[in-house]
Amino acid sequence: MPTTDQPVVGLVLSGGGARSSFQIGALRYLYDTVGITPSVITGTSAGAILGTVIAQSADHEGQRARLAQLDEIWRQMRSSSDMFQELPWFARLRERGPVWLEAFDRRKRRQGALGRSFKRVADLRHGITAPADRTTATTEDAAVEAEEVTATVAAGVAAARPGTGTVARAEPAEPTESSWVPAKLLESIDTLRTVGRAGSDLEEIVEGAQRERSMFRPGPIVDRLLDPEVFEQAQVAESGITLRIAVVALESGELRFVTEQGTMVDRENRPLPEDPVDLVEAVKASCAIPMVFPPVRLGTENYVDGGVRESLPAAIAQDHLGVTECYAVVAGPSTGVAREDSYADKDMLSIVMRTTTMIMTDEVQRDEVVHAKASGAVVIEPEFDVHDTLTIESGLVAIAIDYGHLRAAEAHLGATAEEQAVTRDLIMLRREIWRAEEAAFAPHSATREDEERMRQVARISGMKFELRDLVRAVPADRLPEDGEQWWRSWEQHDFEIPIAPAWAPD
């Protein structure tokens, strides 16, 4: 731990999944304009990845070079599969979902709402079937029940990939069926197997879920970030940086921190009687969102995402590691969870991420942000999410990085409510422009006629002039280097836009 008389600079990075793009933008401002060189770094989940990579160097130039690597890797992501890779059992479940949905629809048309037989299957699930039912059930009854469970399983499956919407499905379920949510899915499949109608697909799904204990494995982005070319844990141990990675033990339920040496300490920085652990595994444990990624074994216990207990690990930095100048960068807003469209048809990952990384985290994070501010930290946080924890779109990632830069400038220099409103309107307008450009030019776009496309381009041109005025309302020292060019060009996309931006002068 640093012991000099100089200010002890600390950097605290929250969790946030794909939303860490905001943090990268904020860090660029802090390193390039403020000139920070933290000697203490703490992080949770995605923040643990960023912090651990930066912690390989103690000098400013070395840390800034690591940040440049993170920036490059983040901008190269193209889809949610870069961060979340489906396991075979879950991929099969998603593949078979539409078939089961169709069976459900046929059953509803033929027989109406699930009645007596649905109740019998529900009774079987809860182990409360009456003795008379058990002794008089026929093979035909079992077949009917199996078909109905198959259909009911389908009602709980959304076949969409993370962050891409949903596929067509049957009519919304009757109120009595609305409680059948993805959390009950595997239980339903197991019931189907019990009544003798499980095929190889269902066997693979059940056995895979029991064996893997998660729906996904970390995508290639994690391997890239932890590749020896980017990250070498020996450099962390030798750099002199004080590092704390937040993890939560499943067995004890306790919040722990892994240090730069791989040792384990409690929330008050007291050493625990555990052998040192591998730092790469500790980072993976800090990112192990329950159900999404499997728990990671560290020493004698299994660990999951540190955000389960502490999303913004500022308290240990400020109260126990001697930090006197603290910069805390939060990936998502702590002012409440924004309302989203209906989750009735969302896939399992979307529901888990919405509850664990947004709703639950918001409740915990509010108190942590209040504590950090009360203890004198400069807290940098967004007022809204440019994209959610699952969305990986290169254009939105770029906008979120720029938003982080602007918000860091506001936090550092101080900004009036009116100035913050300009930033908010500017970033929201860029997001709207990006969506309009996607609608007009993306290969999958519904826009086919040139005349319609030109009308959309005219609308985009008008929004670009609005963007120009907003950019000019932001003090120049708060803009990224290319900020004054934002209105002159197209936003970033994963495809080429075949026409030049006609609104921008040569």
Regions picked out by a protein language model, each given a short descriptive name:
Residues 1-44, 52-506:
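Patatin-like phospholipase
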